[in-house]
Amino acid sequence: MNRLTDPENLTNAFAQQKRNPFLSSGSLILAGGCIVLLLFLLLQGESGNSRHDQSAVSEQETQTSEKTKRKELIAYLQKYPDDEFAHFQLGELIQDRAPFQALENFSHVTERHPRYFEAVEAISEIALEQGLDGRAKSALLILVREYPEEGHYQKRLARLLFAEGKFNWALRYARRNIESGGRQAEDYLLVAEILRQAGRTIEMTGPLKQALYLEPDLYEAHLNLAYAALYSGDPETATREARWCLSENPESTTALRYLAIINRNQGDIDESISYLNQALSIDPQDLECLLLKADILVFQRKGEQAYELLKPLYATQQTDRRYVSALARAAGLTGRREEALELQQLNQRLIKEEDLRPSSLQSESVQKTQAGRK
């Protein structure tokens, strides 16, 4: 007898057929989405390549155009060498490629040109980049007169004058930079560093504290404050700042030397020598530390140790008056009278040579006189 098919089995069979992944609508949608995404990516790739190619072509066309324009301007200036408009255009085109030639072109631009001060600024930038400090200074002097409110010109000029040793003149422009709106820590630090070289140590504290207010962890400001406090009679501040510097840079021979000086001044010679030995283990050729240690040894009547410490440096330091004077004292203390006399004579010659050099005040006075004659 034939059995009828169970209705539940029929239902289950059809249910299994509907769940077939190859025939589900979700799978079809997913497959279609993948195809669309693939086509999109292919089109994007082609579009990106197209844009890249267009950009490369555009850049090449620009370079070709600039090259053609340079040739035209050069040919034109051979016929009309006094055309300052052409000189300005050529200077702009070649400033990055041929800075010295651009400097020459910009130098032909006079005050009659509507963009004269742009040419002067370009001269200052090129001259600074190429180490032509004299040209840069002349250009910056023009710019600070024309744009006294532009602090960055004042700062650049201050740095140049500082490097030349014209400290009082440099200080004037460094302060004008701050008055013009220069309120960054480095602006105050520059003022402090100029004051230091000018020998105006007590005045350093104000700008250094302002720098540290703006940047509490500025290492150079802490180190300069240690120096200012040391030579202004504030050993507590000097000690605190020197130790802070050592915590940031344990190999700072300068901070170690400051601590050595503080301990020497307080009569703790052993501690002072300990700091100096630590510094010299880091840098055996540190002249400042060597001179300080030799001075302490001479004070202790240990002339032979001081002489042995300094003598090996003679070949490289014989033009340094402080070194020659220290070696002369050590030689005299050890009974080397002839050598001590020769060193004293050398020291006198070095003093005369220094006296013949114009000081920063003298050089500023001369430059003012020359400027007044122009």
PLM features per residue range, with description:
Residues 1-15:
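N-terminal intrinsically disordered, acidic low-complexity segments at the extreme N-terminus
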Residues 24-107, 111, 354-360:
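N-terminal leader/linker segments that initiate helical-solenoid repeat arrays
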Residues 62-72, 96-108, 129-142, 164-176, ...:
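Structural signature of tandem alpha-helical TPR/SEL1-like repeats
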Residues 79, 112-113, 146-147, 179-181, ...:
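Structural marker of alpha-solenoid helical repeat scaffolds
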Residues 84-85, 117-118, 151-152, 184-186, ...:
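Helix-start (N-cap) detector for alpha-helical repeat units in TPR-like alpha-solenoids
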Residues 315-355:
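TPR/TPR-like (Sel1-like) alpha-helical repeat modules
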